[in-house]
Amino acid sequence: MTITGHDMDMDTDADADADAVRVLRGLEDSRSSVRLRAALAVGTAPDPRFVDRLVERCAIEPEFFVRDMLTWALTRHPVSMTLPALVREVRSERSQARSQALHTLSKIGDRRAWPAITRKLLSDVDTDVARSAWRAAVVLVPDGEEAGLAEVLATQLGRGERETQLSLSRALVALGDVVEPAMRAAATAPDPYVCAHALATQRLLRDPEAGFEFAIGEARRVMTLGGSGQEGR
């Protein structure tokens, strides 16, 4: 029997298809270790056929470390394929889908995704989504639009517990001195939580090594003494 090049190509294609099926099944396995290995395999040998399934899996994967590997796998694929799928996903009704898509967009870092970072996402009622949006916004914001972003982020000052406030302060500090006008305005807000958060963020702008706990503590002391922390600045 003579084996032709065409026959060999067919065998190769069949093997590739079988491997793809195994990987896709692995992404849905009940064992997190298997899902992790499957995501690693997809990222190690990128295949455009996997993109939609990776995005879909991000929306429902329960384990953080597997989700992180899924994000890594997506960053290994062509942006021309991942970007449209992720931009669609940030409009999903499922909060984890929005959050993970935003996280992945921040890792890809392509500014063409910027229009997808809406005010609605930056103030999302789901804290994880909002925090992901803040991080993505800082990475994707076009040159010259940082001040406008700072004004939107300032509307979230005082929100949530320590970790949420720390995430927002980090995002604002990453934007640099352009956030100062928004922070000065927020530091005079009637809401004491907003005021304290703004003062703490200003402290971190001046001294990023100060630490959030120290900065928020200092802000509260200033407020207790009846000052705004603006004197002499």
Give the role of each language-model region.
Residues 30-31, 62-63, 93-95, 125-126, ...:
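Short inter-helical turns and helix N-cap capping residues of alpha-solenoid HEAT/ARM repeat scaffolds
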Residues 184-233:
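Eukaryotic acidic, Ser/Thr-rich intrinsically disordered low-complexity regions
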Residues 5-26, 45-60, 79-91, 110-123, ...:
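Amphipathic alpha-helical scaffolding segments comprising HEAT/armadillo-like alpha-solenoid repeats
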Residues 33-41, 56, 64-76, 100-103:
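Non-membrane alpha-helical segments in proteins
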Residues 38, 70, 101, 133, ...:
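Conserved hydrophobic register position within alpha-solenoid helical repeats
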Residues 95, 103-105, 119, 127, ...:
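Alpha-helical adaptor scaffolds
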